[in-house]
Amino acid sequence: FEAAGGELFKEKWIKFDEDEPESGDYYIAIDLAGFEEEGSTGVKNKRLDNTSIAVVKANEKGWWVAEIIYGRWDVKKTAKKIFDAVKKYEPNAVGIEKGIARQAVMPYLSDIMRRSQTFFRVDELAHGNKKKTDRVVWSLQGRFENGYVTLNKGEWNNEFLDQLFQFPNKLVHDDLVDSLSYIEQLAKVSYVADFE
């Protein structure tokens, strides 16, 4: 991997472990992209961002990134992908970036919940008036540098690492990195050891 971006993230900081930590809680953060038209071939949409669903198990030792599900889907399929991830991982919290795309997907997600009788709350994630670069650096750089992020191996690894090592680069997508950075707003873990 070449760090063609700002070289904010270094290859030596990347750790892999396929073994799920025994302790911790799951969190899911979603960065929505624009939606494809139903039945669209996607040829003209090649340069659109992906919707990205980051699934992380957090504990006092850091974040274990189970997977990042990503792709370009219509709004119904996006809602189904989110629902399937929540059903599989049973997270403590689910968050979707605030905005028009969130408003578009919520009725479909609510409909799936009603039909399946499986309900969960969806938190609204906000960028807090921070520029994306600042927000991503704040939530991820120190964690990676200090070994507090471990990646599960999966097909998503190459796309994620490409985006991470080239961040920030206007010519490269950053949706997988962005969704992972939003975990910061959901994962409330105490890093303080028990003192006698």
Describe every region a protein language model picked out:
Residues 134-146, 164-167:
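Short, surface-exposed amphipathic charged segments that create phosphate/polyanion-binding patches used
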Residues 1-123, 149-196:
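RNase H-like, metal-dependent nuclease domains and their acidic two-metal-ion catalytic environment used
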Residues 117-136:
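Conserved phosphate-binding/catalytic loops in two-lobed NTP-binding clefts
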